[in-house]
Swiss-Prot record:
GO annotation terms (biological process): photosynthetic electron transport in photosystem II; response to herbicide
Subcellular location(s) of the protein: Cellular thylakoid membrane
Top-level lineage group: Bacteria
PROSITE patterns named in the record: REACTION_CENTER
Binding site for chlorophyll a ChlzD1: 118
Protein name: Photosystem II protein D1 1
Name of the gene this protein is made from: psbA1
UniProt-reported outcome of changing residue 264 to A: Herbicide resistance
Organism: Synechococcus elongatus (strain ATCC 33912 / PCC 7942 / FACHB-805) (Anacystis nidulans R2)
UniProt binding sites for pheophytin a: 126
Propeptide span(s): 345-360
């Protein structure tokens, strides 16, 4: 009998850690990007939850009029938010150690910067982790490319827009009603509804929803029957099976006759590329629109642009939209200034389209 003695493998702790981090056998892949993603997202999540529940009011406008955003100060899930950092801080980096006290840091909205910076770093690492796992599994890198669309949108509203406007107080509040307030103010100050990049973004999001619903319903309607009438159709599919689970020829024929022949894809790969690319490109355009409007390259302005033969203004929808913008702008930061800039300078703008005659 021959005995073979193998030398015991002597990996140090660092080598075993590297192997664990990059192993695709783990239930959840960590990756080197995950080493940074996990602590940053945990920090952002914990700080957001604590601030949403218990943060004191924040002097967002920098005029010593704090705005309460937490649940303990009278808000509910809808109205609550982590209020952006003070206009007095501007674009300054404001970590805890830059404040004279913790109370001052809370009063000036320090938690907002802490959450946003850790969140942006964390989701960037998440995209890198997607690429890393795809690389290790020998897959193409398009998953992280698709994820870059919502990532760019987050960077646009939380970082690029405040930089362009000169203060993190102009960033999007971290709450439901705060998000809608941000949208209203953005429309009032930048006329985003009249910006072509926003229009492309709307087409991307709603078009993507439509295409997703159409694709899902077509596939579900053309499944290859593998079960009886009394069983769920889902039991007719076995994970990893080689056979097609639906009849793409039937789906192509149906949709081609419903619209016209060339509106229907006859190639499953090109179809799924289109389903992925359409919303991604649309959201990319929206992010670019936010980033350009951050520096006040605003949407189209057709106000008072249609005149009759005598030179009088024929009011269009653009003029109605302009009055709505002025109304929203007046309500925004009502105590920070007496009038919005475009109301305080220039000729007076009539509030009503026509003034009724009153006969007493």
């Amino acid at each position: 009998m021959t005995s073979i003695l193998r030398e015991q493998r002597r990996d140090n702790v660092w080598d075993r850690f590297c192997e664990w981090v990059t192993s695709t056998d783990n239930r959840i892949y960590v990756g080197w990007f995950g080493v940074l993603m996990i602590p940053t997202l945990l920090t952002a999540t914990i700080c957001f939850i604590v601030a949403f529940i218990a943060a004191p009011p924040v002097d967002i406008d920098g005029i010593r009029e704090p705005v309460a955003g937490s649940l303990m100060y009278g808000n509910n899930i809808i109205s609550g938010a982590v209020v952006p950092s003070s206009n007095a801080i501007g674009l300054h980096f404001y970590p805890i150690w830059e404040a004279a006290s913790l109370d001052e840091w809370l009063y000036n909205g320090g938690p907002y910067q802490l959450v946003v910076f850790h969140f942006l770093l964390g989701i960037s690492c998440y995209m890198g982790r997607q690429w890393e796992l795809s690389y290790r599994l020998g897959m193409r890198p398009w998953i992280c490319v698709a994820y870059s669309a919502p990532l760019s949108a987050a960077f646009a509203v939380f970082l690029i827009y405040p930089i362009g406007q000169g203060s993190f107080s102009d960033g999007m509040p971290l709450g439901i009603s705060g998000t809608f307030n941000f949208m209203f103010v953005f429309q009032a100050e930048h006329n985003i509804l009249m910006h072509p990049f926003h229009m492309l973004g709307v087409a991307g999001v709603f078009g993507g929803s439509l295409f997703s619903a159409m694709h899902g319903s077509l596939v579900t309607s053309s499944l290859v029957r593998e079960t009886t009438e009394t069983e769920s159709q889902n039991y007719g599919y076995k994970f990893g099976q080689e056979e097609e689970t639906y009849n793409i020829v039937a789906a192509h024929g149906y949709f081609g006759r419903l619209i016209f022949q060339y509106a229907s894809f006859n190639n499953s790969r090109s179809l799924h590329f289109f389903l992925g690319a359409w919303p991604v490109v649309g959201i990319w355009f929206t992010s670019m629109g936010i980033s350009t409007m951050a520096f006040n390259l605003n949407g189209f302005n057709f106000n008072q642009s249609v005149l009759d033969s005598q030179g009088k203004v024929i009011n269009t929808w653009a003029d109605v939209l302009n009055r709505a913008n002025l109304g929203m702008e007046v309500m925004h930061e009502r105590n920070a200034h007496n009038f919005p800039l475009d109301l305080a300078a220039g000729e007076a703008t009539p509030v009503a389209l026509t003034a009724p005659s009153i006969h007493g």
